[in-house]
Amino acid sequence: MTDTMPPDLLEHALAAKGFMPPDEGELLHRVARERLPHGPALEVGTYCGKSAIYLGAAARQVNAAGGSAVVFTVDHHRGSEENQAGWEHHDPTVVDPEVGMMDTLPTFRRTIAAAGLEDQVVAVVGRSTTVAAHWRTPLSLLFIDGGHGEQPARDDFRGWAHWVMPGGLFAIHDVFPDPADGGRPPYEQIYLPALESGAYEEVDALGSMRVLRRVSGTAGDPLGG
Ligand code: SAH
Ligand code: MG
C-alpha cells in the first residue's frame, strides 16, 4: 500500500475550487489513511470539496482493502465572512441569485460526483454548532477548517475536539503562530487550547496545517485541564 494520493484523485483535488495547498492536502491524505481504518473522519468546512477529495481518497483506498471508511463533512454552505461579497476570498460564481446568498453545495456535489467519491464522502449541511450539539460518534480523525472568526473557531473547538478517540488525530488548518502570516483565531482558539487541555500532543506540522494526537481522555467526555 502506498501512502500518496492516487494520481486520478490528485488530479481532481488539484482542479477543485478551494483553499487547500497540494502539500498540505497530501499530509491530510496521509493522516486519513492512517486513521480511517479505526472509525469515521469528520471535516468542518467543506466549501467546494477540495480537502474532502484528499480525505475521500484515503477512504477509497481503505475500502479497497476491505474497510468501511467514511468521511463526514460539515458546512452550511453559505460561506465564511471572508468568502462574502466584497471580501478577499469571494467567488461570485458560488452565489445563488435566487436566495441572494452564497451556496457552495452544488459545486461540492459536482466535484465529489466527478471524483467518484459519493460513497465515501457524506455532506452534512448545517451550522457546525448545531451538528456538533447532536453528534455522538467517536472520530478517528477530526479536521477543522471552518469559520476563522474568533467565535466560530472557539465554537468549533468546544463542539468537536472532545469527539476524537484516544489515539485519534486532530488536524487544524490555517494555524498561524506569527500574526504577520494570517488571522489568529485558529491558532488562539483551537490549536493552543487543544495543547493546553493536555489531551493532545503535536505530531506534525506543514505550512498552516497542524496535526495533533489525542493522548488522554475518552471520546465525548469534556476535555480535561
Ligand atoms: N476545506 C475547504 C475550505 C473551507 S472554507 C477547502 O479545502 O477548500 C471554510 C468553510 O467553512 C466555508 O465553506 C464556510 O461556509 C464554512 N463555515 C464557516 N462557518 C461555519 C459554521 N459556523 N458552520 C458551518 N460551516 C461554516
Ligand atoms: Mg483553510
Pin down the residues of each PLM region.
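S-adenosylmethionine/decaboxylated-SAM
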Residues: D3-F19, G25-G225
